Amino acid sequence: MITNYSEGNSLSTIPVEKNDDILSMEEILEISGLDMMQGILDGIYPPAPISKLLNYNVHAVEKGKVVFRGEPNLASRNPMGTLHGGWYGTILDSAMACAVMTTLPKGKIQTTLEFKVNIIRPIPADVEVDAIGTVEHAGRSTGVAVGRIVDVASGKLYASASTTCIIMTPKLK
């Protein structure tokens, strides 16, 4: 729970998740990355807990492209009342890494090696945005993607980003 200490009022309550609310590594390795992301979109598989925390969801999926739609909440604001830079980074990392995931066959996973975010302008309160991740390269050992955050209503660009992901074949015990 996030609390306003000066007032003693609760700003929002973040539910505590159980491990049952995410796919196991065994389950992930049995499906392609595209099937996993499509399953999350369709409600067959659970979304990543971070998306609930930061108020965004998978909105569209195709091979090499994923769109997350969200609206930053009050808990995502910094002490000055503007949107914390970590929100931009998190939703863009999700969109770009998941776009790379859509290119992977079953038995493969990926994770972010590095990413860079360029915040162009602040996202105002009560604005719904799309974070669009698009793959530029999907190789055997790395994937490269770019991302952007745009206003759903106007198309205004708020941020752009790029990432490199490592592609792995995990060995289960």
How should each PLM-predicted stretch be described?
Residues 1-173:
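Terminal targeting signals and extreme-terminal segments of soluble enzymes
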